[in-house]
Design a protein with these regions (language model features):
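Active/binding-pocket-proximal capping segment
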Residues: 74, 78, 128-131, 210-214, ...
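Asp-box/BNR beta-propeller blade signature and adjacent active/binding-site loops
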Residues: 128, 148, 157-162, 171, ...
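Helix-terminus loop motifs that line ligand-binding clefts
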Residues: 63-166, 173, 316-337, 516-546, ...
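Active-site acid/base region of carbohydrate-active enzymes
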Residues: 3-21, 27-30, 34-52, 56-85, ...
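Non-catalytic C-terminal accessory modules of carbohydrate-active enzymes
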Residues: 306-461
Length: 869
C-alpha cells in the first residue's frame, strides 16, 4: 500500500470523476516501479510516461521512495556510452537515444528534491545525468546547434480520424528536432541547478553557457517572427505571425515553458496557443504526451487559466472528460481510446494526464512554493519541501465555484478550501507547523502568515469599477445550455429576466425560463419554467403552432419539460424530464407533441403586467409568435396565446411604447434577412405590419475574397456581389428630435440602421453605420438624458468569412445614434461565446446588462456610467 497524501475536489463533477480515475490509474500502475498497461504483455516502466507525470503523482501519493529507487534503476540501465534506455529497468532493449524519455531522470530528481526535500537522488544520479547530456550533445548536435535525434515526437496527439492510433496530418505533428532541442535546453538548466546545489560552480557555468548557446540556435532555427500581420490587431484570437516550428501548440508551449521565447514575444506566442485550442481545435485538447505536459500550466502562467479550466472540464472528444463520460475508470492510452484500433490502445495508462494533476493542486487549490514556478524552475533562494508555501488559487476562473484541496507536505498538511460567487470568496486555509505562507487574496493584498488555521472572507473586484454587480442568474440548472436573454425592471425595482434553455438551440426540449431578483436580494431566484412548445394534436392552438404544423411525426411531448402539465393536458403531477438522459419518468399520450422555443422578449406594460413574447418552431423559418403574461411579477405565467397569423412580435429586443402603441422591431429569415416592424395599438388591440423595409446594396463579408481591403469600393455597388443589406433583430432608439431609429445585425461587418419620422409607420431604407458587427445580435437603449448605449460584440467580421468572433462583449455610447465610441469591455475571454445581449436603464439610472455566457449560463452586470473613467 502507498499512502494517499493529497485530495482535491472541485465544483465540476466531470473533473472530479477524472481525478478519481487518475487516482486509480496511478495506483494500479505502481509495482515497485511505475509501469504501464496491465491488459497486454507489456507492463513496462516507460520513462516518458513519467517525465512530467511524476510531479503530478507526487501530489496524490507518497511516492518518494518508489521514485528514488527508480532513479537508481535508470542509472543502472545506462550504457557505458551514456545512452539511457526508454524503459528502465531495461527488460526491453530499447536504447533509442531519445531525449524526451530519458529526460525522466533529471526531471524526477528535481521533483524529489522540491516536493520532498530529498537531494540524494540528485547527488547519486548527477554523474549519469552529466554523462547522458554530454553523450546527446556530442552525438546529435548538428552544425546549427540543433539536437537531431527524436524517436516519439508528440506521442499520441489526437488524430484526425477516430479509428487512427497516430495522426497522419502534418499540421498536428511537431518537429522532433524542435522537441529534442527544447528538452535538451531544459535538461541543461536542471544540470546547472544540480551542479550549483553541490557547489560545482565551474561545471554549472558550463551548463549555463551551453544552454544559452542552444537557446540562440533554437530561435534562429525554429522561430518565425512577422510582427504587424494580425488581421485584427490586439484580438487574442488573431495573433501576429509569431510562432515556433509549424505553429503547433506543443512547439509554442515548449518555448514558453522552458524560458526559450524572448520576453517581448510571449504575449503573441500564447495567443497562438489559445487560438489553436479555441478556434482550430474547437475548444479541445490538441496535444500529445509532450504538449499536454505543459499545456494547462502554460496557459495559466501566461494569463489564460480560464482556457485551462475549459480543457480540464471538457466532456467531448478529445478530452479527459470524454474518457470519463464514455466508461473509463482509469486514464486511456489514447484520447480516442473507445474508437481507435486495438493494436495499441490501453485502457489504463497515465501518460496523457500530462500536467493535469499538478495544475489542479497548484492552480485550483493554489498550493505552490515560494521561488518555484509551476515548471519547477527554482530561484536561488527557492523553498524546498514546502518550507515557504505560496497559496494562490485561480479564483478568477468564473465558472469554478469551489475547490477543496489538501496536501501532506514533509512539514504537515496544507489545506486550501474556497467557495465563491463572482464577487465574493470565502477561503479557509491551514498552514503546517514550522512553515510560512504567502496568501494571495483576490483584492490584490498579500499576507504572510505562520502555521495555523485562517479564514478569509473577501470581495472580488470586478474588472472595472463601473461594474457594480457581476452575477450569474443561476449556478446550476437542469438544462445544459441557455441563450437569447432579455430583462425588464418592475415598478418596485425587482428585476425579471428570461432566456431559452435546453439541450441546445433548436432541440425540442428547449423552453422559456424566467429568473427573478427581488429588489435588495443578494442572488437571483431559481429558474421558473414560463413557457414550452407543447401542443395537443387536433386543437386550434396546434394548428397555429408553426408554418409546417404539428402532426404525428412531430417530437413527442415527453422529450422535454412541460409547464402546468396537469392543468393543461392532464399530465400526472409527478412528471419530470431529465436533460442528461433525455428522458422523462412518465410516458405521455401520443397526441401530445412539442417544438422548440426561441428568443424571449420581456416588456413591462404601463399597468405593471409583464408580457413575455417568444417563438415556437422547429427552425427559424417555422416560427410562430407566442405570448404569455404575468400579473405577479414573473412568479407565475398565463397559458400561451398565439399572435395573429404572420406576426412574430419583437424578434429579439424589447419594444418601445409610443403614443399608446407598442412598436416591435421584428424580422424574418426564411427568404433572406428582412427587417420589418409590428405595431400593436393598445386601444383597439389590433396589430399592424410595416415592411419589409427596403435596403441599400452592399457586399456581404461571405461574398468577397478574404484578401479584400476596401468593402466600400465602387465595384461592390454593382454586379452579383452587390446585394440588399440583410438585417435582422432590431433594437429601437428614441432620438432627441422625436424620430425612431433601429440598430440591426447584418452580414456586412457593420451594424445597419433605419429611421422613422412618423412613430414607426414608415421607415427609411436600411443603410450601414460605421460601427462593427460580427453577424451576431446586439441591443441598445435610449437613456433618460437622451444619450444611447449599445451592447455588442465589438468585432468586425473578416472579409471572406460569414461570422465573426463573439468575444469581446462591450458597451458603446452615442449622442445621436449614428456616431459611437467604445465605452466599456464586459467580457474578453477567448472562449466562445458572449452574445445575444439585452440592456435596460434602471429607475436609478444604472444599466442592467444581460447576455449569453458561453451558451452554458446567463450572465448579468449592473453598470454605473458615472464611474467609467
Amino acid at each position: 500500500e502507498m499512502a494517499t497524501i493529497g485530495h482535491i475536489e472541485t465544483s465540476d463533477t466531470i473533473l472530479n470523476k477524472v481525478l478519481k480515475n487518475a487516482w486509480w490509474g496511478i495506483y494500479g500502475n505502481y509495482k515497485g516501479m511505475p509501469v504501464d498497461c496491465p491488459q497486454r504483455n507489456e507492463r513496462q516502466p516507460w520513462l516518458g510516461d513519467r517525465t512530467v507525470g511524476s510531479l503530478g503523482e507526487s501530489f496524490v501519493f507518497y511516492n518518494e521512495r518508489l521514485y528514488s529507487k527508480w532513479m537508481h534503476d535508470i542509472c543502472d540501465a545506462q550504457r557505458s556510452d551514456g545512452n539511457i534506455p526508454d524503459v528502465a529497468p531495461a527488460f526491453w532493449n530499447y536504447y533509442t537515444d531519445d531525449v524526451t524519455w530519458p529526460a525522466a531522470l533529471p526531471f524526477t530528481c528535481d521533483m524529489l528534491y522540491h516536493q520532498f526535500g530529498n537531494r540524494q537522488p540528485i547527488i547519486d544520479s548527477y554523474p549519469s545525468i552529466r554523462k547522458w547530456i554530454n553523450h546527446i550533445l556530442a552525438e546529435y548536435t548538428d552544425e546549427n546547434g540543433i539536437i537531431t535525434k527524436d524517436k516519439y515526437g508528440d506521442w499520441c496527439v489526437p488524430p484526425e480520424k477516430l479509428e487512427l492510433i497516430h495522426s497522419q496530418d502534418p499540421k498536428r505533428k511537431t518537429d522532433g528536432k524542435l522537441i529534442a532541442t527544447a528538452y535538451t535546453i531544459r535538461c541543461l538548466q536542471l544540470a546547472e541547478q544540480f551542479a550549483n546545489l553541490q557547489g560545482l560552480k565551474e561545471e554549472a557555468k558550463v551548463w549555463a553557457d551551453r544552454r544559452s548557446g542552444m537557446i540562440e540556435a533554437f530561435n534562429r532555427q525554429f522561430l518565425t517572427n512577422k510582427a504587424g500581420t494580425s488581421r485584427r490587431p490586439g484580438h487574442v484570437l488573431y495573433p501576429d505571425s509569431i510562432y515556433y516550428g509549424n505553429n503547433t501548440s506543443t512547439a509554442n508551449l515548449l518555448a514558453l515553458s522552458f524560458g526559450i521565447a524572448p520576453l517581448e514575444l510571449r504575449s503573441e506566442l500564447i495567443k497562438q496557443v489559445v487560438k489553436g485550442i479555441c478556434i482550430d481545435a474547437k475548444e479541445h485538447v490538441n496535444c500529445g504526451v509532450i504538449g499536454i505536459s505543459w499545456l494547462l500550466r502554460g496557459l495559466s502562467d501566461n494569463g489564460f487559466p480560464d482556457v485551462a479550466y475549459l480543457l480540464a472540464t471538457q466532456r467531448t472528444y478529445p478530452s479527459w472528460g470524454y474518457m470519463a463520460e464514455n466508461g473509463a475508470t482509469t486514464i486511456w492510452e489514447l484520447w480516442n481510446g473507445d474508437k481507435a484500433d486495438p493494436k495499441m490502445n490501453s485502457g489504463n495508462h497515465v501518460m496523457l494526464l500530462g500536467d493535469l494533476l499538478t495544475w489542479c493542486y497548484q492552480y485550483l487549490g493554489g498550493i505552490q512554493q515560494k521561488g518555484v514556478n509551476v515548471q519547477q524552475v527554482a530561484e536561488a533562494d527557492a523553498s524546498v519541501a514546502y518550507k515557504h508555501i505560496v497559496l494562490k488559487p485561480a479564483i478568477s476562473i468564473q465558472n469554478c465555484e469551489s475547490v477543496k484541496a489538501d496536501y501532506e507536505t514533509p512539514y504537515g498538511v496544507v489545506k486550501s478550501q474556497w467557495k465563491k460567487t463572482l464577487q465574493h470568496v470565502d477561503w479557509d486555509i491551514t498552514v503546517p507547523c514550522n512553515t510560512t505562507a504567502d496568501v494571495y487574496l483576490p483584492d490584490g493584498k498579500v499576507e504572510t502568515v505562520g502555521s495555523g488555521d485562517y479564514h478569509y472572507s473577501v470581495e472580488i473586484p470586478t474588472r472595472d469599477a463601473a461594474i457594480l454587480k457581476d452575477e450569474f442568474l443561476y449556478d446550476y440548472s437542469g438544462f445544459p445550455s441557455a441563450h437569447a436573454s432579455t430583462i425588464t425592471q418592475l415598478k418596485n425595482g425587482d428585476l425579471v429576466a428570461a432566456y431559452f434553455g435546453g439541450t441546445f438551440e433548436r432541440n425540442p426540449d428547449v423552453c422559456i425560463w424566467v429568473s427573478r431578483k427581488p429588489k435588495g436580494a443578494k442572488a437571483w431566484e431559481k429558474p421558473i419554467l414560463a413557457a414550452d412548445g407543447v401542443y395537443r394534436l387536433g386543437t386550434p392552438e396546434a394548428k397555429k403552432a408553426g408554418l409546417s404544423g404539428i402532426d404525428e411525426k412531430t417530437t413527442p411531448a415527453d422529450k422535454g419539460p412541460i409547464k402546468d402539465g396537469l392543468r393543461r393536458f392532464g399530465v400526472p403531477a409527478g412528471y419530470k424530464y431529465d436533460f442528461r438522459s433525455k428522458s422523462a419518468n412518465i410516458k405521455l399520450p401520443a397526441n401530445l407533441k412539442r417544438k422548440s422555443c426561441w428568443n424571449p422578449v420581456l416588456y413591462t406594460m404601463p399597468d405593471g403586467e409583464i408580457w413575455l413574447f417568444y417563438k415556437v418552431g422547429s427552425t427559424v423559418g417555422d416560427w410562430t409568435g407566442c405570448l404569455v403574461k404575468s400579473k405577479d411579477g414573473g412568479k407565475t405565467w398565463s397559458d400561451p396565446e398565439a399572435l395573429p397569423d404572420g406576426f412574430l412580435g419583437p424578434i429579439k429586443n424589447k419594444p418601445e411604447m409610443v403614443n399608446g402603441r407598442l412598436i416591435c422591431g421584428s424580422s424574418t429569415e426564411k427568404n433572406g434577412w428582412r427587417f420589418h416592424v409590428e405595431i400593436l395599438d393598445l386601444k383597439t388591440n389590433k396589430w399592424k405590419y410595416v415592411g419589409p423595409v427596403d435596403a441599400e446594396l452592399k457586399p456581404r463579408t461571405d461574398d468577397v475574397d478574404s484578401a479584400t481591403v476596401d468593402m466600400e469600393h465602387p465595384i461592390y455597388k454593382e454586379g452579383e456581389k452587390a446585394r440588399l443589406i440583410y438585417s435582422i433583430q432590431p433594437s429601437i432608439l428614441k432620438l432627441k428630435d422625436g424620430r425612431l431609429q433601429v440598430l440591426m445585425r447584418t452580414h456586412n461587418a457593420k451594424l445597419a440602421t433605419s429611421f422613422s419620422s412618423d412613430g414607426g409607420d414608415t421607415w427609411t431604407p436600411v443603410t450601414l453605420l460605421d460601427i462593427e458587427n460580427n453577424q451576431s445580435g446586439t441591443d441598445a437603449v435610449t437613456l433618460k438624458d437622451g444619450r444611447h448605449v449599445l451592447i455588442y460584440n465589438n468585432f468586425e467580421t473578416l472579409p471572406g468569412t460569414k461570422k465573426g468572433s463573439r468575444t469581446p462583449l462591450s458597451l458603446a455610447i452615442s449622442d445621436d445614434g449614428t456616431h459611437w465610441r467604445h465605452l466599456l469591455t464586459l467580457e474578453d475571454s477567448p472562449i466562445n461565446q458572449y452574445s445575444y445581449p439585452g440592456i435596460i436603464e434602471g429607475k436609478d439610472g444604472k444599466l442592467h446588462c444581460i447576455y449569453t455566457w458561453r451558451r452554458q449560463r446567463v450572465a448579468y452586470k449592473e453598470v454605473d456610467l458615472k464611474k467609467i473613467k
